[in-house]
Amino acid sequence: MEYQYPMNEDWTTEEAVDVIAFFQQVENAYEKGADRDRLLNAYRRFKEIVPGKAEEKKICSQFEADSTYSPYRTVKQAKQSDQAIIKM
C-alpha cells in the first residue's frame, strides 16, 4: 500500500520516528501479527508525544483513512488480550 504517515511539523525527528514506529506496529498487527508488548510500548510512547485525545483521534483517523488499519481497535484488542501476538 502507498500512503503517508500522519505528521506534525512541531515534532522532533525522534518523535516522528517513534510515531511511525507505533503505526508500523499497527500495520504488523494487520499484516502478520504484532508482539503485544512492543505494540503497547509503542502506544505508550505515542501517547507521550500526542497526549491529547482530540489530536490522537485526528491523527489516528487520518492513518485509518489512508491505510484502512485502525489504531484504536488494535490497541483496544492488545489491552484486552493476554496473547503474546496480536493479529487483526
Swiss-Prot record:
InterPro entries: BH2638-like_sf, UPF0223. Coiled coil: none annotated. It holds the Pfam family UPF0223. Belongs to the UPF0223 family. This is UPF0223 protein RBAM_014500. It comes from Bacillus velezensis (strain DSM 23117 / BGSC 10A6 / LMG 26770 / FZB42).
